């Protein structure tokens, strides 16, 4: 991995690395925050998945997470949201193509050549992190919007791999809302059964489980009713007896002003779970 940015932050280092991804067949950037304790010992990892139009920079520059990661001794890994490059398929819209990988493995041309974000986040990136950084095998996952969807899907499909999962403003029923329907039709085709593998509410209804789900949702979020549908997640978790910590916040929107207001509580939540054995 090639170091391309290095910034001192709260006694540790906020770095950005570039590497070639075998899964995605392109160069990828990834943000890695190494807290002070990483100089002397191995630490657990929190993976953060960002939302539509984002790259590795949004979370590391806007959330203020470094203060809390340093306090709780957690390495934070923030990858890009899709494969990148002039040779990678793209679309003339913000919610499909580069910047909108939806953390799935595409099966339809032209997307299936590069868009394997599920494999990248689940397998390739953790292996790289374990190899290049002082990381233990303990990991948790979180994300915002499309990234919250990705975090929930990865945790629900691989419950033994993640100590905990949380999300800000996640797309919980993508097969039922425009963002998800448009992306899934392009990436996965018209067989809607394939869509359900990347739909948190559907996965839970089929019996997939995690110990607990933490979600924060702003009630002044313009996408709340049409695209996000947080109550759908709350309802299915109640029906399937999955413990939740779902909090609704008056006045908060879909932006990083919202994420930065509560990211400290999410990192503390994950730190507690990561340190349990």
Curated annotation (Swiss-Prot):
Catalytic activity field: S-formylglutathione + H2O = formate + glutathione + H(+)
SUPFAM superfamilies with a match to the protein in the record: alpha/beta-Hydrolases (SSF53474)
One of the record's GO molecular function terms: carboxylic ester hydrolase activity
Keywords: Hydrolase, Serine esterase
Record-listed E.C. numbers: 3.1.2.12
Gene3D superfamilies: alpha/beta hydrolase (3.40.50.1820)
Disulphide linkage map: none
A GO CC annotation given for this chain: cytosol
Domain of life: Bacteria
Keyword Isomerase annotated: no
GO biological process: formaldehyde catabolic process
Family annotation (InterPro entries): AB_hydrolase_fold, Esterase-like, S-formylglutathione_hydrol
Xref: PANTHER family: S-FORMYLGLUTATHIONE HYDROLASE
Protein name, as recorded: S-formylglutathione hydrolase FrmB
């Amino acid at each position: 991995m090639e170091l391309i940015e290095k910034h001192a932050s709260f006694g540790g280092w906020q770095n950005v690395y570039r590497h070639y991804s075998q899964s995605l067949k392109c160069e990828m950037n990834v943000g890695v925050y190494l807290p002070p304790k990483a100089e002397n010992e191995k630490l657990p990892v929190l993976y953060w998945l960002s939302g539509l139009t984002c790259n590795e920079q949004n979370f590391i520059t806007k959330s203020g997470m470094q203060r809390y990661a340093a306090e709780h001794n957690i390495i934070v890994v923030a990858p890009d949201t899709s494969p990148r490059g002039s040779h990678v398929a793209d679309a003339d819209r913000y919610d499909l193509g580069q910047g909108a990988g939806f953390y799935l493995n595409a099966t339809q041309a032209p997307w299936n050549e590069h868009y394997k974000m599920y494999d990248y986040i689940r397998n390739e990136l953790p292996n790289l992190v374990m190899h290049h950084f002082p990381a233990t095998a303990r990991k948790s996952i979180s994300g915002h919007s499309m990234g919250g969807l990705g975090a929930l899907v990865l945790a629900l499909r691989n419950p033994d791999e993640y100590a905990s999962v949380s999300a800000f403003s996640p797309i919980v029923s993508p097969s039922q809302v425009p963002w998800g329907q448009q992306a899934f039709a392009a990436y996965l085709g018209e067989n809607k059964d394939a869509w359900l593998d990347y739909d948190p509410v559907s996965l839970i209804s089929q019996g997939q489980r995690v110990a607990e789900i933490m979600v924060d949702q702003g009630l002044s979020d313009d996408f709340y009713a049409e695209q996000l549908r947080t109550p759908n997640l709350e309802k299915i978790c109640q029906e399937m007896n999955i413990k939740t910590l779902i909090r609704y916040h008056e006045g908060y929107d879909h932006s990083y002003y919202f994420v930065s207001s509560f990211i400290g509580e999410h990192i503390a939540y994950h730190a507690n779970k990561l340190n349990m054995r």
